[in-house]
C-alpha cells in the first residue's frame, strides 16, 4: 500500500540511477531519456560539475535564512540578469512560486488587478497560477477560480485587444506552450503583444519555466522574438533537478517588492544556488547554446524526413530541443511502446508526443530516438 496521495499517473517503472542521458531501473533496463524530468535535467543526470558544486556546498552550510547576506545568491542573480536583460531576481523553489511572485509583483507595481493569459497555457497548480492557466482540466473540482484572469486564444491579437482595459496589470505569455501541445508563438503575434503592452502601459510577463535556460538554443526563448519583457519566470532547468525557481524583473519594479512584501523560507537556498551557478556557468557559454541550436535542427529535420509521410503523423513542430509530434490519434499507447523499447518520451495533451532530451544529448542519440519513433509510428500507420 502506498502512503502517497495518488496525484500522479505513474508509469510502471522504478528508476534506481541515472548518468548523462541514460536512466536505469530496478530490473536492469536502460532508457534513453527524452523527458529530462520534464525539461529539468538539461545537463543530463548527475552532471559532474553540478555534483561537485552541490557537494562542496554541503560541507559549508545548508541553510541560514534570507535574513543574512548570501554571496552565492548574488552570483546566480548576476548570471541571470546579465543573460536576460533584467535587473533584479527573487528566488523561490518552483515554477508555480515564480509565477505567483510575478502575479503579485504586477498587481502591486501597477495598482491594477486584471491579468490576461492564453488558452492552452500552463502556469502552475497553486490557486493563483491555476486561475492563470488556460486549461479547464486542471481546475475541475476546486471551486471558483480567481475572477481577475482573462483567457484569450493563443496567437489571436484581435481577441487580445478586445480584452485589455484600464485595469489590465499584465499579460502572461509562453513563447512555446509546452504543456498545452508544444504550440509555437507566431512572430507577428509576439511583436503585436509587445506593442499592446507598450501602448497601454501593461506589464509583459514571460513564463520561461519550460523554455528557459538554453532549451531552445538561446538563453531564453523570448530572445528569438520582438519581445521586451518586464518580468521573466524560470525554474525547471535552473537547478538541473535541484528545486529552484526565480522571478526576474526590470529596474522600475524593484521598489514595489520592498522588505516584507514577499518571501520564501527556502528561496535562494545555498545548495540550490550551488546547483544553479554550476548549471548557468555551463549552459550560458556561446558554444553550448550554438550546439543546442544545431542539435535542434538535426532533430527536427530527422523527424520530418522519417515521419512526415506517415498517415498517423499530423504535424511536427518545435524549437531547439523542445519538439512535439502531433498525431491523428491519442499518443499514450505509442508513448508506452517507446518506453518498452527503451526510449522515454511524454505527452503534451492527448495527441502530442513531446520530446525533451537533455541539452547534452549526442548526435548519435538523436538519430537513435528518431529511428525508434519511426519504427513505432510506422507500424501504427501500417495497421491503420
Curated annotation (Swiss-Prot):
The protein's matches in Gene3D superfamilies, at most eight in alphabetical order, are given as: Aspartate Aminotransferase, domain 1, Type I PLP-dependent aspartate aminotransferase-like (Major domain)
Output the Gene Ontology cellular-component terms.
cytoplasm
Q: Which GO terms describe its biological process?
A: L-arginine biosynthetic process
What's the superkingdom here? Bacteria
Localization, UniProt: Cytoplasm
Partners and quaternary state? Answer: Homodimer.
**Protein name, per record:** Acetylornithine aminotransferase
Query: Which species is listed as the source?
Result: Halalkalibacterium halodurans (strain ATCC BAA-125 / DSM 18197 / FERM 7344 / JCM 9153 / C-125)
- Lineage of origin: Bacteria, Bacillati, Bacillota, Bacilli, Bacillales
Q: Name the gene for this chain.
A: argD
Amino acid at each position: 500500500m502506498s502512503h502517497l496521495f495518488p496525484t500522479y499517473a505513474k508509469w510502471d517503472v522504478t528508476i534506481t540511477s541515472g548518468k548523462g542521458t541514460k536512466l536505469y531501473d530496478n530490473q536492469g533496463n536502460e532508457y534513453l531519456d527524452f523527458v529530462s524530468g520534464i525539461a529539468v535535467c538539461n545537463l543530463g543526470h548527475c552532471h559532474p560539475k553540478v555534483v561537485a558544486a552541490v557537494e562542496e556546498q554541503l560541507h559549508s552550510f545548508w541553510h541560514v535564512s534570507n535574513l543574512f547576506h548570501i554571496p552565492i545568491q548574488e552570483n546566480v542573480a548576476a548570471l541571470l540578469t546579465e543573460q536576460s536583460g533584467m535587473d533584479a531576481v527573487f528566488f523561490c523553489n518552483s515554477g508555480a512560486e515564480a509565477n505567483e511572485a510575478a502575479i503579485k509583483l504586477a498587481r502591486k507595481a501597477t495598482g491594477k488587478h486584471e491579468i490576461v493569459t492564453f488558452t492552452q497555457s500552463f502556469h502552475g497548480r497553486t490557486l493563483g497560477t491555476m486561475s492563470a492557466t488556460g486549461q479547464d482540466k486542471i481546475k475541475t473540482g476546486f471551486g471558483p477560480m480567481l475572477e481577475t484572469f482573462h483567457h484569450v486564444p493563443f496567437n489571436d491579437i484581435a481577441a487580445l485587444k478586445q480584452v485589455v482595459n484600464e485595469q489590465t496589470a499584465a499579460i502572461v505569455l509562453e513563447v512555446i506552450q509546452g504543456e498545452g501541445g508544444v504550440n509555437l508563438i507566431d512572430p507577428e503575434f509576439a511583436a503585436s503583444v509587445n506593442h499592446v503592452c507598450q501602448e497601454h502601459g501593461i506589464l509583459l510577463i514571460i513564463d520561461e519555466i519550460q523554455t528557459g535556460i538554453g532549451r531552445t538554443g538561446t538563453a531564453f526563448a523570448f530572445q528569438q522574438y520582438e519581445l521586451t519583457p518586464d518580468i521573466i519566470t524560470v525554474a525547471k532547468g535552473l537547478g538541473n533537478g535541484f528545486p529552484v525557481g526565480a522571478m526576474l524583473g526590470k529596474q522600475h519594479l524593484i521598489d514595489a517588492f520592498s522588505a516584507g512584501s514577499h518571501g520564501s523560507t527556502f528561496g535562494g537556498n545555498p545548495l540550490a544556488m550551488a546547483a544553479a551557478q554550476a548549471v548557468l556557468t555551463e549552459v550560458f557559454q556561446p558554444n553550448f547554446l550554438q550546439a543546442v541550436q544545431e542539435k535542434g535542427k538535426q532533430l527536427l529535420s530527422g523527424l520530418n524526413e522519417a515521419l512526415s509521410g506517415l498517415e498517423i503523423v499530423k504535424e511536427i513542430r518545435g524549437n531547439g530541443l523542445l519538439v512535439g509530434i502531433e498525431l491523428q490519434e491519442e499518443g499514450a499507447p505509442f508513448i508506452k511502446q517507446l518506453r518498452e523499447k527503451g526510449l522515454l518520451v511524454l505527452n503534451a495533451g492527448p495527441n502530442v508526443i513531446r520530446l525533451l532530451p537533455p541539452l547534452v544529448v549526442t548526435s548519435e542519440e538523436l538519430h537513435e530516438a528518431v529511428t525508434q519513433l519511426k519504427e513505432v509510428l510506422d507500424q501504427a500507420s501500417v495497421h491503420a
